[in-house]
Amino acid sequence: MAAEDGAKIAAQRIGSGNPVIGKEKAEAGRCRECHGADGNSSDAKIPNHAGQYAAYLVKQLSDFQSGARRHEIMTIMAEDLSAADMADIGAYFADREIMQGDGAGANGLGRNLFDNGDRGRDIPACASCHGTRGKGGIAGNVIYPVIGGQRKIYLRSQLVGWKLGDRKNSPDGVMNKIAESLSDDEIEALADYISGL
């Protein structure tokens, strides 16, 4: 059963796109210039995409295209992509080796919030959606991104964006509700912990 679940999760990670064609499209579309040749960015402000769920990447590209998510450069990069382009590019990055953390993942406050949340403030455990160690792996739960090992500065900026309402494209606004309840110190602790996973 565990092997079946692993195969199912691997298939869900890639989705319906073609990773071989996606590589060609990602290279032609200049994705590698910012997100790295293997989907791991060398710029701390730019997210890693290696090992990310294709469905999540497709949603983000669609949101940039529609204006549901705003970013000056990514809006331009996504504007001419077809649904097939997005699926193929998503499959390519999903098929890359999953991003690895560069920190120790030892922040106690961050770990507690990640593993347990805070019921008194209606903050669910991050792991309940993002999986153990933030690497996904929850069958059928492909719209919540892999966050373990993501860039600390990027993680912090996204949590702050959700808290302030600058980013609003999470399903049912769940990330806005969670981030609004976090203190600046908790955001810093979570970014530090998650980046080290």
PLM features: what roles do these ranges have?
Residues 1-27, 42-43, 95-122:
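Electrostatic cytochrome c docking/interface patches
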Residues 8-66:
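The feature marks the first
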Residues 42-48, 63-105, 140-145, 163-197:
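Axial heme c-ligation environment in periplasmic c-type cytochrome domains
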